[in-house]
């Protein structure tokens, strides 16, 4: 078996790298690390994991309101969920779905929204995770 230590990075395709970098730093709360010289990729830090925004020339086909399918979830600090929700609203972000899910693998209140290209994102106050070491 391979000993995986964690997620090194994940990437999200975007139509406008500079515009998306502003969204992911100002709205989502990521920290800018680097931009490639040609401006086609931006590297962001998400609490120790690298998120790469990658320029796509072909149309990106989002799945609207797909909160149960492909999406990217960002854990907010415990007790900061209400402030994160207000932060989204203050930036004019439309909330597509909100719930407090309990009794599953990933538990806690969560909210779903879209980035500028329609990628589904989630903020969650992760109160428990079934995969946590005992």
Residue map of PLM features:
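A generic structural signal for short beta-strands and their flanking turns/coil linkers
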Residues: 8, 40, 49, 68-70, ...
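Conserved beta-strand in the GNAT
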Residues: 52-54, 121-122
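A short local loop/turn or secondary-structure capping micro-motif enriched for an aromatic residue
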Residues: 53, 59-63, 92, 129-132
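Core segments of cupin and vicinal oxygen chelate
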Residues: 13-52
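Vicinal oxygen chelate
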Residues: 3, 6-15, 45, 62-87, 91-134
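N-terminal beta-strand motif that seeds the catalytic metal site of vicinal oxygen chelate
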Residues: 1-18, 72, 127-134
């Amino acid at each position: 078996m391979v000993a995986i230590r964690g997620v090194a990075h994940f990437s999200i395709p975007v139509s406008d790298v500079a515009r998306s970098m502003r969204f992911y730093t100002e709205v989502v709360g990521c920290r800018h690390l680097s931009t490639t010289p040609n401006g086609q990729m931006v590297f962001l830090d998400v609490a120790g994991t690298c998120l790469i925004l990658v320029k796509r020339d072909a149309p990106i086909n989002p799945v609207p309101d797909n909160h149960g399918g492909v999406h990217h979830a960002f854990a907010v600090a415990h007790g900061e969920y209400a402030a994160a929700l207000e932060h989204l609203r203050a930036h004019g972000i439309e909330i597509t779905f909100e719930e407090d899910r309990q009794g599953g693998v990933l538990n806690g209140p969560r909210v779903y929204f879209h980035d500028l290209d329609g990628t589904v994102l989630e903020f969650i106050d992760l109160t428990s995770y079934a995969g946590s070491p005992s």
